[in-house]
A protein has these predicted regions:
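A composition-driven surface/loop motif
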Residues: 6-15, 20-334
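Hydrophobic alpha-helical transmembrane segments of integral membrane proteins
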Residues: 2-3
Length: 334
């Protein structure tokens, strides 16, 4: 038997979280392209200002300079790489279907600054194969363990008004790296687009440093975590509608050492905890979970609705938890 635990909280307290403050830049208009590329199974065809800012090797496109690059077409084994340290790059996905067999479909190199813009009204698909996993294929030196790989120190924004479907047959759907002294600050921001992720092996979205899911429509099916960040995970922002997130299947839904839900319409079906403030690699850390807005429907089949290994604060929003009526499964565990 399930029990329904509703928590209705008025936004009476002001948060001191900078994560929820400020306004979101919703500008995702399609950019004018410097170069247009068409992927085929036999190669990449360039049109526009050719021979500047990029390299083509068979079905591998490498971006080496700032600019706006539009990619379309279809390829059964190809990839896009943004070279280490390259900033001011906009990749426009304009009806692209791209599979990469043994590495990431898109790799953003260390210390790069990249906007991946999904063009208005287009449907795009990125995928990999089981070989893109160096745990299972240690001989594969090119494995990146994600369909979209954002390396340490990279700043990546995934946005636009189109639709992107990611199928992660190797390991993760999207993987974002860490902030380091050598490579700089790392972050991943998701905004506006329609994003579908099927991750039957591991996490749908996995970040090491800072992950902002500001807006858009996300549908996620994951074997492990749906949306995970080792440190700070922000969902929505104060004064905005926030994202619509539908997690149809996962082990844990939203997980971060500092987990902030500021706005959004979120449904989570999890075999363990729906929301979890934790990181097993951090032994001395002030874990926090703060809910200041949005609507959350949590369906934990074998865990807690909300599980914080530190403070749990609810100052606003609507929270509904459906949980088994057992001692091990609590609506709130803090």
């Amino acid at each position: 038997m399930k029990k329904l635990l509703p928590f209705l909280c008025a936004s009476a307290l002001a948060l001191s979280l900078t994560a929820c403050a400020g306004t979101i830049n919703n500008s995702t208009a399609d950019a004018a392209s410097d170069v247009t590329f068409t992927f085929t199974n036999s190669g990449v065809i360039a049109a526009g200002e050719t021979n500047t800012g990029y390299e083509i090797d068979g079905t591998v496109l490498t971006i080496t300079d700032s600019g706006t690059y539009t990619v379309s077409g279809s390829c059964a084994d190809g990839s896009i790489k943004v070279k280490k340290g390259t900033t001011g790059v906009t990749l426009v996905l304009d009806g692209l279907t791209l599979t990469s067999e043994n590495t990431a479909a898109i790799t953003c190199g260390k210390s790069s600054e990249v906007t991946i813009l999904v063009s208005n009204g287009t449907e795009n698909s990125l995928s990999d194969t089981e070989q893109n996993n160096d745990d299972n294929y240690p001989e594969n030196e090119n494995a990146e363990n994600a369909v979209i790989k954002c390396k340490d120190g990279s700043t990546v924004t995934l946005c636009g008004d189109g639709e992107l479907t990611i199928t992660a047959n190797g390991k993760n759907g999207i993987k974002s790296g860490a902030t380091t002294d050598e490579d700089g600050e790392a972050s991943l921001t998701i905004r506006d687009l329609t994003l579908n992720i099927d991750a039957p092996v591991n996490d749908a979205i996995n970040a090491e440093q800072l992950l902002n899911v500001e807006s858009g429509t996300l549908t996620i099916d994951a074997a492990d975590d749906a949306i995970h960040c080792d440190l700070v995970l922000n969902i929505g922002a104060d004064g905005t509608d926030g994202p619509t997130i539908d997690i149809t299947n996962c082990c844990e839904g939203l997980e971060g050492a500092e987990l902030n839900v500021c706005s959004g319409d979120i449904t989570i079906n999890a075999s363990d905890d729906c929301l979890n403030a934790a990181n097993s690699d951090l032994t001395d850390y002030d874990f926090t979970m703060t809910i200041s807005g949005g609507t959350i429907d949590a369906y934990p089949s074998g865990g807690d609705g909300f599980d914080s290994n530190g403070d749990l604060t609810i100052t606003g929003g609507t929270v509904i938890v459906w949980t088994d009526n057992t001692a091990d499964n609590e609506p709130l565990d803090a």
